[in-house]
Amino acid sequence: MQRHHLLPCQLLTRRCFGPLFDLIGRDRLGFDDFRSNVLLLPASGESAVRLKLPLHRGPHRDYNAMVLERVGQIEGDWSRLRLAAPEVALDQALMRFALLQRALRRRLLETERKRVRLNRRDPFGAGLDFAELDAMAEALWAGTAPGLRAQ
């Protein structure tokens, strides 16, 4: 098992988030706190399949990019609101970070929906045949070709 940071440590290296993180503080966001920001995920393909959890090995760029985008939204709203109501802006940012962390944890642990793939080595989905799905998509695409009238 390996530690996975729900809010990636990469966030702390982004200067654009510096003012917000300087105000909030690394400890308040719980960057290294298992209860709020860390999740243990399998480090081997066999464990990932057995536990039905995402494989945590190597970089997970798409996940980090998605989280960076969400944090950018939080930071943008905080930047606008802090000029008029700094305390409200801080409280709102802290609440949104907590909600984001809970949502990320819940999504990574979910087994009913399509599993999150943190990296390309995740065995989930290996060997799946999408021929039938591709055929259905092709039929839908052909049915929506320009010039066809709705009936």
Task: Kindly give the residue locations of the regions a language model identified.
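C-terminal, well-folded lobe of enzymatic/effector domains
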Residues: 49-151
